[in-house]
Amino acid sequence: TGYNRALIAERAHDILTAIAWARDLPDSELVHLAGLDRAGPWAILAAALSEGALTSLVANRSWGFEELEDARHPDFLPGALRLGGMTGITAACAPLALELTDDAPLDPALLSAWRAAGAAPPKVAP
């Protein structure tokens, strides 16, 4: 391939490795993930790729891909905007139990994703 993974992809991979480790612990039935501050979007990205390994996710949307102005930014992910940015990636987490710790309103696309999955909509912390 000749190309390195973006740093944010490496971070999401590290989180996925931690999720797999937690799932393999003796007597481990539930895995909850919290991504706070700058790591919120990393956790959302990992959760979208976790294929049902998580029980719940608490995260914030501290930034969005559309805010990144430089391809050298550590959180730049090629193609992220084609996926719908953070909203599209977050929608891929449905039907995971999700609580967002920021006060931004829920995008209608998120509500639609959880509704289509037959799950309770994400919660937004007051």
Predicted feature locations:
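Cap/lid segment of the alpha/beta-hydrolase catalytic domain
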Residues: 1-23, 63-74
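Hydrophobic alpha-helical scaffolding
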Residues: 5-8, 12, 46-47, 76-83, ...
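Extracytoplasmic/secreted proteins, especially bacterial periplasmic and envelope-associated proteins
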Residues: 14-17, 42, 88
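Short glycine-enriched nucleophile-adjacent loop
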Residues: 20-24, 40-51
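Alpha/beta-hydrolase fold nucleophile elbow
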Residues: 22-37
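Core-facing hydrophobic residues within beta-strands of well-ordered domains
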Residues: 28, 53-54
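The feature captures the conserved acid-bearing segment of alpha/beta-hydrolase catalytic domains
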Residues: 55-116
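Short acidic-hydrophobic, aromatic-tinged amphipathic segments that line or gate anion-handling sites
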Residues: 123-126
